[in-house]
Amino acid sequence: MWRLKIAEGGNDPYLYSTNNFVGRQTWEFDSEYGTPEAIKEVEEARQIFYKNRFQVKPCGDLLWRFQFLREKNFKQTIPQVKVGDGEEVTYEAASTTLKRSVNLLTALQADDGHWPAEIAGPQFFLPPLVFCLYITGHLNVVFNVHHREEILRSIYYHQNEDGGWGLHIEGHSTMFCTALNYICLRMLGVGPDEGDDNACPRARKWILDHGSVTHIPSWGKTWLSILGLFDWSGSNPMPPEFWILPTFMPMYPAKMWCYCRMVYMPMSYLYGKRFVGPITPLIKQLREELFSEPFEEIKWKKVRHLCAPEDLYYPHPLIQDLMWDSLYLFTEPLLTRWPFNNLIRQKALQVTMDHIHYEDENSRYITIGCVEKVLCMLACWVEDPNGVCYKKHLARVPDYIWIAEDGLKMQSFGSQQWDCGFAVQALLASNMSLDEIGPALKKGHFFIKESQVKDNPSGDFKSMHRHISKGSWTFSDQDHGWQVSDCTAEGLKCCLILSTMPPEIVGEKMDPERLYDSVNVLLSLQSENGGLSAWEPAGAQAWLELLNPTEFFADIVIEHEYVECTGASIQALVLFKKMYPGHRKKEIENFIAKAAKYLEDTQYPNGSWYGNWGVCFTYGTWFALGGLAAAGKTYANCAAMRKGVEFLLKSQKEDGGWGESYVSCPKKDFVPLEGPSNLTQTAWALMGLIYARQMERDPTPLHQAAKLLINSQLENGDFPQQEITGVFMKNCMLHYPMYRTIYPLWAIAEYRTHVPLRLS
């Protein structure tokens, strides 16, 4: 039976940590673990998911929850409450629902203080890991028979009815993910005419019906070239010389968004090497299965710009195709011939590899995310198949593996700090006695303090295109090392609030100098327009987005400002200013004023704000209203607050909640959800209205939303898993299963505190 292990590093000599692996999550299969009842519970969860897989596509992330609740002998002892038709929500009903949620949330906390959770959803994360291990010969070493069973389960369970796979689990089928998952099935031993529900024949038919893999997007062309299923001449150039450009060039790496930089860094190394994996009998078979014409007869030069319409979200502008053509026709032939291949190309490859090693070391071989992880790992193997760097990469593969009732997934990377910050704030908002929530707050406080990044990247980090990180929080854990502004804001808020509480109950408060370091990071990430970027200062020329080489993402070339990062940072710095009024007072006041102005300036005409990391306008509006309220803006003195409230009230559904389709994100236009409300989005909207003091004008919409949340609570105190609610880069969704547990609790807590309720 599968078992989640927390904060363990084992005795692997290739594994090291900055904080004794606090926050690390790894799964192992233990044949001795689990009673017959526990095994039956897991199998029933799998069957229920499979039966309903086309109705609710995100999993409930139940395996670790079953494990934790079983190990803690959790029993929900408080009876469920329902508010009947025509009845008012009473203080007692809200309190009972809240306490039941808190009981469950505290039981789900790990011993190191964080709340484990899946963070997956995209269907192009896992296949490249399988490809890499297949090439290096470690597929059977890393993935045993139990892993393989779960990988196949995940692929089968998320195959669309038309035979393809979407960019993410709720998306329409795409060439990119259908081809990648088909190849993955074949590498795991599934025959071309095999697979559950004829998975392989159906997928192959979809691929061939849509033009064959010659129409795969550029990232797919790269992976197929690496595998020997494409010729490198069928891909647009990715010259490693990019890494030795002079600083005045518009495309200088330091001006790029960090994820764009980190993906194309190992890609350019592999491209520059023209690396191709071993041409095995399986690769030769796949050459016959995936194309509509003989492999040897394909005119590779003509397929470079092909992309299936199902994959095309960002069509390349003409100027970009002209740039690729120039590089392809003139630059590459020059750089790959003597003497330039020795004078320039070899130097560029070495500089690129130096950057890869630097990033690997500074993230403890986790890297910035899963797409980059696999590419960097493969680059290290290509450089030295028996080298220490590749072995260190292998040791961190388990950090990315997640298992739920719908099988094995590759995480984007962990969301430990992100989820923990919100869970702690939800518990604090509950206003329950410290006897009840004190132990959970103490553990959460410990995790947050342990997870703060204590140092900047090593050495001359600016020459390696890195920004300060000392004092920040990452999205996952301290070992990851990458600062994020909103994660830093949420961590700072938690530490500030907990510092006002008895240390014997919630733990010792954080040293003020470490709080000052956090403030320094936030101040450094504000742009001239007042907005906050996420990872590094924004400021590169906007026209560089015309060179976005991906077809299925938008706004990936340069760093941008984000509503959520801005709103969260205002809240954190307003709180900090109250508690430390003498520290950088003028800078912080200017920061808050500029940030509030940015929120006012970026409001949509309908009163909403676009959410970059959650679905979508509901999410962005929650953060914006929270930031504006913290900055002193009110419904009476701020038109943006009034318009934001109007947007939320107009979009409230008949059942009292809110529901927004993920399609809002790529369309950049509010698209209501068909059917019932989404409870996570309802919680966001409810809290947004409370920030704007809606209860002082007309509390009815708040009562309606709270009633829906209360009546939707499950027997164990949780809330049902519904539609996917996370997003990145406009077009790809992320599944955050802890959201359904945290946000309804938090919203009910704020509702009970701020909205006058009748006593029964």
UniProtKB/Swiss-Prot annotation:
Soapwort saponins possess anticancer properties and are also being explored as enhancers for endosomal escape in targeted tumor therapies. They may also serve as precursors for vaccine adjuvants. Pathway: Secondary metabolite biosynthesis; terpenoid biosynthesis. One of its GO terms (cellular component) is lipid droplet. One of its GO terms (molecular function) is beta-amyrin synthase activity. One of its GO terms (biological process) is triterpenoid biosynthetic process. PFTB repeats lie at residues 98-140, 148-189, 441-485, 515-556, 592-632, 641-683, 702-743. It catalyses: (S)-2,3-epoxysqualene = beta-amyrin. SUPFAM superfamilies: Terpenoid cyclases/Protein prenyltransferases (SSF48239). This is Beta-amyrin synthase 1. It comes from Saponaria officinalis. The gene is bAS1.
